[in-house]
């Protein structure tokens, strides 16, 4: 659901107008992010802008906007940077052959590679660049998780928010297992998964058993799990949030693989403001259970 693009630094260095045009096309809510490839991508943009715009107000404006780019626009790539002595496009194509980007946006395409989009010709009608902030999905555990898979692969903290979350039920446990597997393999140390559900009047001992009987059996080493309870009246919406963005699920985080519920769901990627509000709402509470 979220596309990751490699964007040549020189594309942003021709003018402030071009810089703004491209940056505004990206963000988790739009279904597109820029891969921070290589790690010093911002430095490369500024150096290219210096070469083209030294002594102009445009350079200063680019410098300011470059510092303000948020994590939901420029996503940590976690990829090797390749041979720094090679041109950026050669490095990007080498990485693309190993772990494909959704596309590569560059000033030119000397090798006529089908996945390289020339910046001056790019528009929203190009199917390679098209992306959507909302999508109907089949309610399978794989599709539920894949909507935010790119974010989970970079996440340090994840919040699963569903007022009825019950890991003793297979329809939630399947999705939870997939999330934990992605967090186990995302290469970060000290990853935390939070589960937020309602305090619906279930006896505390019974609520505790929901999690004690399942979480220790599926929690991978290196991932801590915390459970939070909230007043039932305060919980309505369902989200998967990560520290780099998130999505809302209109029906729930449970799948319909057993065929007893709604077969589809509408998933919406969150704008930066909505994400910040929901992240704050589900932060700062005392945990009901912690599994380390």
Feature annotation, model-predicted:
Residues 166-170:
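Acidic-and-aromatic substrate-binding clefts and catalytic sites of carbohydrate-active enzymes
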Residues 141-149:
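Short, charged beta->alpha transition segments
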């Amino acid at each position: 659901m979220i596309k990751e693009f490699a964007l040549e630094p020189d594309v942003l260095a021709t003018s402030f107008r071009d810089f703004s045009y491209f940056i505004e096309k990206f963000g988790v809510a739009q279904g597109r992010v820029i891969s921070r490839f290589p790690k010093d991508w911002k430095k490369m943009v500024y150096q290219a802008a210096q070469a083209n715009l030294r002594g102009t107000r445009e350079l200063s404006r680019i410098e300011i906007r470059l510092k303000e780019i948020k994590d939901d626009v420029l996503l940590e790539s976690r990829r090797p940077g390749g041979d720094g002595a090679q041109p950026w496009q050669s490095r990007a194509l080498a990485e693309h052959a190993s772990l494909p980007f959704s596309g590569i946006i560059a000033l030119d395409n000397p090798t006529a590679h089908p996945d390289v989009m020339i910046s001056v010709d790019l528009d929203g009608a190009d199917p390679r660049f098209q992306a959507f902030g909302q999508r109907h999905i089949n309610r399978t555990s794989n599709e539920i998780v894949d909507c935010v898979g790119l974010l989970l692969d970079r996440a340090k903290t994840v919040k699963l928010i569903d007022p009825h979350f019950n890991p003793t039920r297979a329809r939630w446990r399947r999705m939870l297992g997939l999330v934990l597997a992605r967090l186990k393999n995302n290469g970060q140390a000290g990853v935390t998964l939070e589960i937020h559900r309602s305090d619906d009047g279930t006896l505390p001992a019974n609520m505790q058993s929901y999690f004690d009987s399942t979480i220790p059996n599926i929690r991978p080493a290196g991932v801590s799990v915390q459970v939070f309870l909230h007043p039932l009246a305060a919980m309505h919406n369902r989200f998967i949030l990560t520290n780099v963005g998130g999505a809302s699920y209109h029906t729930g985080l449970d799948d319909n693989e057993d065929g007893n519920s709604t077969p589809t769901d509408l998933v919406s990627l969150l704008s930066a403001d909505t994400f910040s509000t929901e992240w704050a709402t589900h932060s700062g509470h005392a945990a009901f259970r912690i599994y380390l």
